[in-house]
């Protein structure tokens, strides 16, 4: 499974959205109707899955699916 598929699967499961709604440009709040609790749970799940901590400062910048993918790729490249 690719990184994109992994992240999409987590988002679908955490937010209860249809997989077809999850694209790189999807905004968690505007497009996927996530609230702050949803986003906190999503960040925690991503941290657990990818085995690194996402700072509160970084988490606030993760507004779209593409933002999350780019962030994970950067962190994995370290």
Swiss-Prot record:
Source domain of life: Bacteria
Residue intervals of the Carrier domain: 1-76
InterPro entries: ACP, ACP-like_sf, PP-bd_ACP, Ppantetheine_attach_site
Pfam families in UniProt: PP-binding (PF00550)
Family affiliation: Belongs to the acyl carrier protein (ACP) family.
Signal sequence residues: none
Annotated protein name in UniProt: Acyl carrier protein
SUPFAM superfamilies, per the entry: ACP-like
Function of the molecule: Carrier of the growing fatty acid chain in fatty acid biosynthesis.
Gene3D superfamilies in alphabetical order: ACP-like (1.10.1200.10)
């Amino acid at each position: 499974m690719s990184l994109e598929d992994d992240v999409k699967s987590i988002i679908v499961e955490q937010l209860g959205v249809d997989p077809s709604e999850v694209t790189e440009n999807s905004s968690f709040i505007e497009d996927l109707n996530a609230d702050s609790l949803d986003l906190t749970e999503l960040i925690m799940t991503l941290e657990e899955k990818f085995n690194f901590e996402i700072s509160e400062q970084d988490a606030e910048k993760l507004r779209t699916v593409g933002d999350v993918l780019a962030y994970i790729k950067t962190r994995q490249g370290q």
